[in-house]
Amino acid sequence: MVAFTSLLAGFAAIAGVLSAPTESSVEVEKRQTIGPGTGYSNGYYYSYWNDGHAGVTYTNGGGGSFTVNWSNSGNFVGGKGWQPGTKNKVINFSGSYNPNGNSYLSIYGWSRNPLIEYYIVENFGTYNPSTGATKLGEVTSDGSVYDIYRTQRVNQPSIIGTATFYQYWSVRRNHRSSGSVNTANHFNAWASHGLTLGTMDYQIVAVEGYFSSGSASITVS
């Protein structure tokens, strides 16, 4: 996609279905290739969604590990983390991330009251999610400057159903596929620009793609 607004439309479709509550939460085996759903895998919460296009294989591994392989995938997003998340967690992630096309590696989650969808983007493929957005500020954390943005979604799917809500973004300038993210640094920086979070819902390290191909193998802790 060539515009931030069109990207967000794709994100809304992805994130809305990703975040919608399901009844598929189950404790899965140590390593298992799964279909779309949410649940727990070796002590970590996972969430995986795709739009039904062929070519995506999501596999939960041991501990906080997961792998994704995709080709001409349509929309998908999947990853592992915590339910609920916290506002001061230091999230460690490591592994490989090899996108060809439009794809993202990010800390992703939601809060309630206010209803907020948020991203801390660590790496991306050919499309920069800040394209066309209004920059509110920046924060230096974990070895890089991140640019801060806010966008709004109107009557879009969310963790409470169709709603109007804001999205908060930190986009890292120096891409990486391994490291630590001090989420408090981002949340505090957002708050200094009036971007406050409510009660935390889930918080995961997510790989997502939009009509692209690639592979990722990530471990979260």
Swiss-Prot record:
Query: What reaction gets catalysed by this protein?
Result: Endohydrolysis of (1->4)-beta-D-xylosidic linkages in xylans
Physiological role: Endo-1,4-beta-xylanase involved in the hydrolysis of xylan, a major structural heterogeneous polysaccharide found in plant biomass representing the second most abundant polysaccharide in the biosphere, after cellulose.
Cellular component annotations (GO), alphabetically ordered? extracellular region
Subcellular location, record wording: Secreted
Thermal dependence of activity, per record: Optimum temperature is 50 degrees Celsius.
Specify the species.
Trichoderma harzianum
**Active-site residue numbers:** 117, 208
Per its UniProt entry, which superkingdom is the organism in?
Eukaryota
Q: Which residues form the GH11 domain?
A: 32-221
What name is this protein filed under?
A: Endo-1,4-beta-xylanase 2
Looking up InterPro entries in the UniProt record yields: ConA-like_dom_sf, GH11/12, GH11_AS_1, GH11_AS_2, GH11_dom, Glyco_hydro_11
Could you say which residues form the signal peptide? 1-19
Q: What class of enzyme is it?
A: hydrolase
Record-listed E.C. numbers: 3.2.1.8
| Gene Ontology terms for molecular function | endo-1,4-beta-xylanase activity
Q: How does activity depend on pH?
A: Optimum pH is 5.1.
